[in-house]
Regions:
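C-terminal alpha-helical interaction appendages
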Residues: 1-67
Length: 67
């Protein structure tokens, strides 16, 4: 991917925050559980690799692969 490290980290943080917000606001998970669910997932590990391109995907699409 032709994305700077700074842009990649920003996009990763944004999509992660949005996934957590969806889990808490729409699915009713407590914040701590939502954070744990996202950060401890295999998906989050893959999201941390810019080569996967997952940071370009929508939070809802990513969540569909989390559950």
């Amino acid at each position: 991917m032709n994305v700077s490290e700074k842009d990649f980290l920003y996009m990763k943080e944004q999509v992660t925050a949005k996934m957590i917000a969806i889990l808490t606001e729409e699915q009713g998970l407590p914040l701590e559980l939502a954070i744990d669910k996202v950060y401890s997932s295999e998906l989050f590990q893959k999201l941390g690799n810019a080569e996967t391109g997952l940071f370009f995907q929508s939070p809802r699409y990513l969540l569909s692969h989390l559950q």
